[in-house]
A protein has these predicted regions:
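Mid-chain, well-packed structural core segment of small domains
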Residues: 63-76
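Conserved hydrophobic register position within alpha-solenoid helical repeats
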Residues: 7-10, 38, 69, 101
């Protein structure tokens, strides 16, 4: 548990330094909490590459990762994620994911970049 907390802190620090490629390396970590942290961190880095890295996380098996990725996509105005977020908002099995994705989708479709 302590190792995971330390890894989450490391990922957030990498995000604060805008190190997208270093953050992306953890996007396939076996622990969903780590992948969720990756999604949230990518939401702090408003680049095309961050948005592209969110796409696999929007398809993650864990609902909290999908919800975090949809929110992160809206946070960075990743218009190229809009269709993926829309699918989650209207078709995901998990009601929490649908709620987070619906909010994110509304923000994405109204944002102008």
């Amino acid at each position: 548990m302590a190792r995971d907390d330390a890894l989450k802190d490391k990922i957030i620090k990498l995000g604060n330094k805008q190190k997208v490629s270093a953050v992306i390396k953890y996007s396939d970590h076996p622990n969903p909490d780590i992948r969720m942290t990756v999604a949230m961190t990518l939401g702090m880095i408003p680049t095309y590459d961050s948005g592209m890295a969110l796409i696999p996380l929007l398809r993650d098996t864990d609902p909290m990762v999908r919800a975090s990725a949809s929110t992160a996509a809206a946070d960075i105005h990743a218009k190229h994620c809009e269709e993926y977020v829309k699918k989650l908002a209207f078709a995901d099995n998990d009601p929490n994911v649908r709620q987070a994705a619906k909010s994110a989708f509304d923000r994405l479709k109204s944002s102008v970049v």
